[in-house]
């Protein structure tokens, strides 16, 4: 409160009155200025923190074999020359020759052509123009990549296939870097991103060392050597997220080694690489907890239940076999769930769908991670192979807390990349009326889904519609079973949720 003299003695001289009133006026001005300054300071501290933009891309599945006449040219060219080759007019017999490759190497549909890749990059330039960093959460290479290569080069020399894989990966990453100049691009490998076939990879390989050299370009010098070393060992690495994010770190995993389908290039199962990676992850999270770092974790294959495969065999889920799981064990989910106080976001992909999940420890007691758990964002695909519309995600992040505040899914009007219009599919905050994508907010939405088996809530209907980007709401047919997987990441918990008591 500002006080001014109001009671003046009648005997005071005019000079005294002038001086007194002047001083009172000055005091009033200074007081009001101080009050305004305090108000501005208070407003500054209570106003919502300014967010920064980030880009999430996944499952690009770029197919360089779509015009077979160009494949020998690509094999001879450097990745920096690929765009010129791919942009040239298609060969006259392109369709017939590619159909022959598809017959030899059948897939569900077609992956990402150069036209679609180029269209998506143009949309990214427009929609993510302010991005401070970008993530690619795996599967840069087309499905049946190794089969298509052998069909194109039946007499290829040893090592040629690996060289072509390395060139393709480099080309795709460099194209995204060119679309967002100066923006760090962080990449996790997926099950297709291998020099020896789908779900096959050797730890401590020359392939991982070569790709690690490429993917760590632009990393801070103080961190690049360590990142290259761990990536060469098992496809995992640690890097500090860029300013203006503060004291925030990204841990990138190659959880192909943890997959239920994983084998070495020689076709043998081997759990040692997964065990080493999980030990590294736990050590990194322990250090981060001690130094009060905020962590994001990114990998390709999510932990938990493969709902699509499990829903086709519900009798097995409720029987002795149990549900189909994405990973060979539940150790990744268990490690992550123990560090819910450290990890602000986990990014996965693999299903090609737009999904959310939450990881919560089943027996956490009073541990720091018990309160809310960990939010999981599963990024939808650029590839339209499942009939979905190509899409990517533009996110907003709180630089102080590293919490994902909001995101928008941007989808294509067609799968060809020709005359394609990209539009906003939905906005998380607007669709679900949540202040952020924190564990508390995601947990609240999941709880709502769990209570809405009949799909009467607007949020449930929105999720069903947005899950299969641009396509029909088929998820509604298995909605109760699907919802069981959003929180119940262990086989036992999922089975208890889905199956009637006692069966």
Question: For the regions a protein language model found, what residue spans apply to each?
Answer:
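N-terminal secretory signal peptides that target proteins for export/translocation
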Residues: 1-17
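Bacterial N-terminal signal peptides
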Residues: 20-34
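Active-site environment of divalent metal-dependent phosphoester hydrolases
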Residues: 63-64, 142-145, 187-198, 259-261, ...
